[in-house]
């Protein structure tokens, strides 16, 4: 369908920072793909203070909505502001660096049926620092899967679609850097919203990567742990307390047998530390449960079962998954 600035079904949010070489090609590829689909759409381009002429070129394109930053704020800030400005019920995220299959954006919208978010799971790794990046991403993804108790094929793909009404509840939690995509996945899972995945091809990006391996990997790890601590602190702290308690208890048994019932100070310190961490975990979980906001937006799976707004929930309450 055609571009609509009034009441689009789909809003496509694209962060741009110094992408002048392939900007026109990517935007036209996105427009052609969406015009061939059944969805009315708008394209929101957020220029993150480009210095290569991207801003000036974007200002000449009449069929996009342009948001231009005066200072560089990061891809997370760009996508967050673009999503807040979106008018469509569905928001698509992608890039304009030739890495994602932007001609398949309508496929994401179709796959969203029955889900709150759909992520394009990359089948190959074509990024920079490949030798170090692949094992680092594998470790972070496995950590996220363990913390969230959910299978996650691709944790930090920037090619995704989601319901805007759900995302609006959590946009304030998104960091400004690259870890915002990880946050978007984790925050949906932590709050009971469904995330689906579709396999996509991933190409070597054009131009220079803005990814900083050491700094951004550290931020990914911190953000994954922070997200789970905000909604399930017992998942993080209980194993730590258990390990310390087992170590302390083993040392206690050793002291009682080997030292004529004299318990070492270090043994008591380990056991007490385990107890303190467990108490902190319980208190943190209590705070989370008391302060957890009541969702104003029901998950897609609940709505599909006829328990959405405006429906009688009296006889259906026991059917909630």
Model-derived segments and spans:
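Conserved catalytic loops of nucleotide-sugar-dependent glycosyltransferases that act on lipid-linked
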Residues: 74-79, 83-86, 99, 103, ...
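Residue-level detector of alpha-helix boundaries and kinks
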Residues: 15, 67, 128, 151-152, ...
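Single, functionally critical "micro-switch" positions that shape active/binding sites
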Residues: 17, 51, 162, 240, ...
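Membrane-embedded multi-pass helical conduit in multi-pass membrane proteins
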Residues: 233-315
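Structured catalytic core of nucleotide-sugar glycosyltransferases
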Residues: 1-131, 138, 165-171, 183-190, ...
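Short conserved micro-motifs on helix faces and helix-strand junctions that flank
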Residues: 15, 69-71, 160, 238, ...
